[in-house]
Amino acid sequence: FYVTKKGVCVNTKDMGTAVDPASMNVGWYYNWDWKSFKDMSFSNKKFDDLEFVPMIWGDSMTETSEIFDNVKSKGYKYLLAYNEPDLKWESNVRPDVMQYRWNDCVNNKGNVRLGSPAVSVFPTWSNDWWTPFWNSMAADKKNAMSFIAVHSYQKSYDGAKSALQYLQAIDECWETYHKPIWITEFAFWKFSINDAAGCAKVQEFMKIVIKGLNERSYVERYSWFSFNTTDNSNGASALWTNSTGKLTDLGNIYVNN
Protein backbone atom coordinates (compact mmCIF):
# COMPACT_ATOMS: atom_id res chain seq x y z
CA PHE A 1 0.00 0.00 0.00
CA TYR A 2 1.05 3.60 -0.52
CA VAL A 3 1.08 4.48 3.22
CA THR A 4 -0.79 3.37 6.30
CA LYS A 5 -4.39 2.99 5.17
CA LYS A 6 -5.75 4.76 8.22
CA GLY A 7 -6.27 8.50 7.95
CA VAL A 8 -8.25 11.30 9.53
CA CYS A 9 -10.58 13.98 8.17
CA VAL A 10 -10.53 17.30 10.03
CA ASN A 11 -11.69 20.85 9.38
CA THR A 12 -10.42 24.22 10.58
CA LYS A 13 -13.61 25.20 12.41
CA ASP A 14 -13.50 22.83 15.37
CA MET A 15 -12.45 19.27 14.55
CA GLY A 16 -8.75 19.92 14.04
CA THR A 17 -7.96 22.65 16.53
CA ALA A 18 -6.67 20.51 19.43
CA VAL A 19 -6.14 16.93 18.28
CA ASP A 20 -2.60 15.61 17.83
CA PRO A 21 -2.43 13.32 14.77
CA ALA A 22 0.69 11.70 16.21
CA SER A 23 -1.57 10.15 18.85
CA MET A 24 -3.91 8.75 16.19
CA ASN A 25 -1.65 6.22 14.43
CA VAL A 26 -2.65 7.68 11.05
CA GLY A 27 -0.61 8.18 7.90
CA TRP A 28 -2.52 10.96 6.12
CA TYR A 29 -5.26 13.56 6.45
CA TYR A 30 -7.60 15.69 4.39
CA ASN A 31 -9.59 18.80 5.28
CA TRP A 32 -12.16 19.22 2.46
CA ASP A 33 -9.89 21.84 0.87
CA TRP A 34 -7.10 21.99 -1.69
CA LYS A 35 -4.82 23.85 0.72
CA SER A 36 -3.09 22.07 3.58
CA PHE A 37 -3.29 23.33 7.15
CA LYS A 38 0.33 24.42 6.81
CA ASP A 39 -0.46 26.56 3.76
CA MET A 40 -3.47 28.02 5.59
CA SER A 41 -1.24 28.96 8.58
CA PHE A 42 -3.65 26.95 10.72
CA SER A 43 -3.17 27.24 14.49
CA ASN A 44 -2.61 23.50 15.01
CA LYS A 45 0.89 22.93 13.63
CA LYS A 46 0.89 19.24 14.53
CA PHE A 47 -0.49 18.35 11.09
CA ASP A 48 2.39 20.01 9.25
CA ASP A 49 4.46 16.83 8.89
CA LEU A 50 1.54 14.51 8.08
CA GLU A 51 0.78 13.62 4.46
CA PHE A 52 -1.97 15.88 3.13
CA VAL A 53 -4.45 14.86 0.43
CA PRO A 54 -6.13 17.85 -1.26
CA MET A 55 -9.73 18.00 -2.47
CA ILE A 56 -11.76 19.86 -5.06
CA TRP A 57 -14.82 20.27 -2.83
CA GLY A 58 -17.17 21.77 -5.41
CA ASP A 59 -17.82 24.52 -7.93
CA SER A 60 -17.46 27.23 -5.27
CA MET A 61 -13.70 26.63 -5.13
CA THR A 62 -10.95 28.12 -7.31
CA GLU A 63 -10.71 27.22 -11.00
CA THR A 64 -9.80 23.58 -11.58
CA SER A 65 -6.60 24.44 -13.44
CA GLU A 66 -5.32 26.56 -10.54
CA ILE A 67 -6.02 23.77 -8.07
CA PHE A 68 -4.14 21.27 -10.23
CA ASP A 69 -1.24 23.69 -10.63
CA ASN A 70 -1.02 23.86 -6.83
CA VAL A 71 -1.30 20.08 -6.47
CA LYS A 72 1.52 19.53 -8.95
CA SER A 73 3.77 22.28 -7.56
CA LYS A 74 3.42 20.83 -4.05
CA GLY A 75 4.17 17.33 -5.30
CA TYR A 76 0.89 15.85 -4.06
CA LYS A 77 0.20 12.39 -5.46
CA TYR A 78 -3.57 12.24 -4.96
CA LEU A 79 -6.61 14.46 -5.34
CA LEU A 80 -10.12 13.91 -4.01
CA ALA A 81 -12.85 15.27 -6.27
CA TYR A 82 -16.25 16.74 -5.33
CA ASN A 83 -17.82 16.20 -1.93
CA GLU A 84 -21.30 14.63 -2.03
CA PRO A 85 -22.47 16.22 -5.30
CA ASP A 86 -25.75 14.31 -4.93
CA LEU A 87 -26.79 16.49 -1.94
CA LYS A 88 -28.16 20.02 -2.31
CA TRP A 89 -26.52 21.13 0.95
CA GLU A 90 -23.11 19.79 -0.09
CA SER A 91 -21.37 20.41 -3.45
CA ASN A 92 -24.67 19.90 -5.34
CA VAL A 93 -23.60 19.15 -8.92
CA ARG A 94 -25.96 17.32 -11.29
CA PRO A 95 -24.60 14.16 -12.97
CA ASP A 96 -24.78 15.74 -16.44
CA VAL A 97 -22.86 18.82 -15.25
CA MET A 98 -20.32 16.60 -13.49
CA GLN A 99 -19.40 15.11 -16.87
CA TYR A 100 -17.90 18.48 -17.83
CA ARG A 101 -16.27 18.96 -14.43
CA TRP A 102 -14.78 15.47 -14.58
CA ASN A 103 -13.42 16.10 -18.08
CA ASP A 104 -11.68 19.22 -16.73
CA CYS A 105 -10.16 17.15 -13.94
CA VAL A 106 -8.96 14.46 -16.33
CA ASN A 107 -7.49 17.02 -18.73
CA ASN A 108 -5.54 18.71 -15.93
CA LYS A 109 -4.51 15.78 -13.76
CA GLY A 110 -1.16 14.83 -15.30
CA ASN A 111 0.33 12.08 -13.11
CA VAL A 112 -1.89 12.83 -10.11
CA ARG A 113 -4.02 9.89 -8.96
CA LEU A 114 -7.57 11.21 -9.19
CA GLY A 115 -10.38 10.01 -6.96
CA SER A 116 -14.01 9.86 -8.00
CA PRO A 117 -16.71 12.26 -6.84
CA ALA A 118 -17.79 11.02 -3.39
CA VAL A 119 -21.55 10.50 -3.29
CA SER A 120 -23.32 10.32 0.07
CA VAL A 121 -24.07 6.57 -0.12
CA PHE A 122 -22.33 3.55 -1.60
CA PRO A 123 -21.98 4.16 -5.38
CA THR A 124 -23.75 0.88 -6.06
CA TRP A 125 -26.79 2.24 -4.17
CA SER A 126 -26.81 5.67 -5.88
CA ASN A 127 -29.21 5.06 -8.74
CA ASP A 128 -30.17 8.73 -9.09
CA TRP A 129 -26.66 10.17 -9.26
CA TRP A 130 -23.73 7.78 -9.52
CA THR A 131 -25.28 5.30 -11.97
CA PRO A 132 -26.17 7.89 -14.65
CA PHE A 133 -22.81 9.62 -14.13
CA TRP A 134 -20.88 6.38 -14.56
CA ASN A 135 -22.95 5.06 -17.46
CA SER A 136 -22.61 8.24 -19.50
CA MET A 137 -18.85 8.48 -19.01
CA ALA A 138 -16.54 7.65 -21.92
CA ALA A 139 -14.18 4.72 -21.42
CA ASP A 140 -11.06 6.89 -21.29
CA LYS A 141 -12.63 9.07 -18.61
CA LYS A 142 -13.45 5.98 -16.55
CA ASN A 143 -9.87 4.79 -16.94
CA ALA A 144 -8.63 8.14 -15.60
CA MET A 145 -10.41 7.47 -12.30
CA SER A 146 -7.64 6.06 -10.11
CA PHE A 147 -9.89 5.13 -7.18
CA ILE A 148 -13.47 5.41 -5.97
CA ALA A 149 -14.15 7.56 -2.89
CA VAL A 150 -16.88 6.13 -0.67
CA HIS A 151 -19.00 7.81 2.02
CA SER A 152 -21.26 5.70 4.21
CA TYR A 153 -23.05 6.24 7.51
CA GLN A 154 -24.75 3.58 9.59
CA LYS A 155 -28.19 4.37 10.99
CA SER A 156 -28.86 1.04 12.71
CA TYR A 157 -26.91 -1.88 14.11
CA ASP A 158 -27.95 -5.50 14.35
CA GLY A 159 -24.85 -7.02 15.87
CA ALA A 160 -21.85 -8.28 13.93
CA LYS A 161 -24.13 -9.04 10.99
CA SER A 162 -24.41 -5.30 10.27
CA ALA A 163 -20.63 -4.90 10.18
CA LEU A 164 -20.29 -7.84 7.82
CA GLN A 165 -23.02 -6.42 5.59
CA TYR A 166 -21.05 -3.19 5.45
CA LEU A 167 -17.99 -5.08 4.26
CA GLN A 168 -20.12 -6.89 1.70
CA ALA A 169 -21.19 -3.51 0.32
CA ILE A 170 -17.53 -2.56 -0.03
CA ASP A 171 -16.89 -5.85 -1.83
CA GLU A 172 -19.81 -5.16 -4.16
CA CYS A 173 -18.35 -1.77 -5.05
CA TRP A 174 -15.04 -3.41 -5.96
CA GLU A 175 -16.67 -6.22 -7.90
CA THR A 176 -18.82 -3.78 -9.87
CA TYR A 177 -16.21 -1.18 -10.84
CA HIS A 178 -12.83 -2.87 -10.26
CA LYS A 179 -11.34 0.33 -8.91
CA PRO A 180 -9.34 0.68 -5.69
CA ILE A 181 -11.43 2.16 -2.87
CA TRP A 182 -10.86 5.01 -0.45
CA ILE A 183 -13.49 5.29 2.29
CA THR A 184 -13.18 8.98 3.04
CA GLU A 185 -16.12 9.25 5.46
CA PHE A 186 -17.76 6.56 7.57
CA ALA A 187 -19.37 6.60 11.00
CA PHE A 188 -22.72 6.22 12.77
CA TRP A 189 -25.59 8.69 12.56
CA LYS A 190 -26.87 7.46 15.87
CA PHE A 191 -26.18 7.25 19.62
CA SER A 192 -25.05 9.82 22.16
CA ILE A 193 -21.71 9.29 23.87
CA ASN A 194 -23.72 8.96 27.10
CA ASP A 195 -25.55 5.94 25.65
CA ALA A 196 -23.37 3.08 26.90
CA ALA A 197 -25.17 0.43 24.86
CA GLY A 198 -24.98 2.57 21.74
CA CYS A 199 -21.27 3.22 22.26
CA ALA A 200 -20.68 -0.53 22.58
CA LYS A 201 -22.39 -1.09 19.23
CA VAL A 202 -20.27 1.53 17.48
CA GLN A 203 -17.11 0.08 19.01
CA GLU A 204 -17.96 -3.45 17.92
CA PHE A 205 -18.76 -2.21 14.41
CA MET A 206 -15.44 -0.38 14.19
CA LYS A 207 -13.36 -3.36 15.32
CA ILE A 208 -14.95 -5.71 12.79
CA VAL A 209 -14.96 -3.25 9.90
CA ILE A 210 -11.41 -1.96 10.32
CA LYS A 211 -10.10 -5.52 10.48
CA GLY A 212 -11.95 -6.23 7.24
CA LEU A 213 -10.72 -3.07 5.54
CA ASN A 214 -7.13 -3.81 6.51
CA GLU A 215 -7.47 -7.31 5.04
CA ARG A 216 -8.81 -6.09 1.67
CA SER A 217 -5.96 -5.19 -0.65
CA TYR A 218 -8.23 -3.13 -2.90
CA VAL A 219 -9.13 -0.81 0.00
CA GLU A 220 -6.22 1.62 -0.15
CA ARG A 221 -7.25 4.12 2.51
CA TYR A 222 -9.99 4.97 4.98
CA SER A 223 -10.86 7.78 7.40
CA TRP A 224 -13.54 7.70 10.08
CA PHE A 225 -15.66 10.86 10.47
CA SER A 226 -15.34 12.00 14.08
CA PHE A 227 -18.45 13.74 15.40
CA ASN A 228 -17.87 15.81 18.53
CA THR A 229 -18.52 14.27 21.94
CA THR A 230 -21.03 17.07 22.62
CA ASP A 231 -23.23 15.99 19.70
CA ASN A 232 -26.29 14.52 21.41
CA SER A 233 -27.30 12.53 18.33
CA ASN A 234 -23.97 11.19 17.06
CA GLY A 235 -21.39 11.66 19.83
CA ALA A 236 -20.78 7.92 20.13
CA SER A 237 -18.84 8.20 16.85
CA ALA A 238 -16.39 10.76 18.27
CA LEU A 239 -12.72 9.78 18.14
CA TRP A 240 -11.73 12.74 20.30
CA THR A 241 -13.22 15.74 22.09
CA ASN A 242 -12.81 18.73 19.79
CA SER A 243 -12.02 21.27 22.50
CA THR A 244 -9.24 19.23 24.14
CA GLY A 245 -8.11 16.67 21.55
CA LYS A 246 -8.41 13.92 24.17
CA LEU A 247 -9.14 10.55 22.60
CA THR A 248 -12.36 8.75 23.44
CA ASP A 249 -12.64 5.00 23.97
CA LEU A 250 -13.61 4.74 20.30
CA GLY A 251 -10.59 6.85 19.38
CA ASN A 252 -8.31 4.42 21.18
CA ILE A 253 -9.92 1.55 19.29
CA TYR A 254 -9.25 3.41 16.03
CA VAL A 255 -5.63 3.88 17.05
CA ASN A 256 -5.03 0.26 18.03
CA ASN A 257 -6.83 -1.63 15.27
Where are these regions (language model features)?
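Solvent-exposed loop/turn segments at secondary-structure junctions
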Residues: 12-15, 33-37, 57-61, 83-88, ...
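N-terminal carbohydrate-binding/catalytic regions of secreted carbohydrate-active enzymes
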Residues: 2-78, 101-104
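Loop/turn elements at helix/coil->beta-strand transitions in domains of secreted/extracellular proteins
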Residues: 2-6, 23-28, 48-52, 74-79, ...
